[in-house]
């Protein structure tokens, strides 16, 4: 069963597509939802100058784009950029953002194979079976060593 995302901001004419999952988002709210629910699948290649340009051009959110650009110049962690996006428009409550940040902290304490397992699970949710299977195989090989 899907969820309804109420969009209060401008809807983009051209979507932003996340490379790993091929999921396209058309609004700030969809972007927030995707980031919040797929943190282990989001990488540096997703949160780049291309994203800030899309936010500026398609969503008319220049202030958010400027904040992302500043974080990119500082080579900030991916999680810090995601938090900036989540906080910006108030789509998630401060408590939900705190939970997100706690989950980010928890990820930093996991072993690499545990993070990879979470990534594989994420790909499985998106029916990217080959990618998920390859990661699961790598984990099994790693654990057998």
Question: Residues of each region from the PLM?
Answer:
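Long, contiguous interaction/recruitment modules in multidomain scaffold/adaptor proteins
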Residues: 1-112
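Alpha-helical segment of the N-proximal tetratricopeptide repeat
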Residues: 105-142
């Amino acid at each position: 069963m899907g969820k309804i995302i109420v969009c209060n901001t401008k809807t983009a004419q051209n979507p932003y597509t996340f490379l790993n999952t091929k999921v396209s988002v058309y609004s700030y709210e969809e972007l927030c939802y995707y980031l919040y629910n797929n943190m282990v699948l989001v990488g540096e290649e997703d949160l780049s100058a291309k994203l800030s340009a899309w936010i500026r051009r398609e969503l008319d959110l220049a202030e958010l784009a400027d904040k992302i650009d500043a974080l990119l110049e500082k080579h900030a962690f991916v999680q810090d950029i995601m938090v900036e996006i989540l906080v910006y428009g108030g789509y998630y409550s401060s408590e939900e953002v705190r939970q997100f940040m706690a989950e980010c902290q928890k990820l930093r304490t996991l072993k690499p194979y545990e993070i990879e397992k979470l990534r594989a699970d994420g790909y499985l949710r998106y029916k990217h079976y080959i990618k998920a299977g390859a990661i699961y195989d790598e984990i099994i090989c790693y654990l057998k060593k």
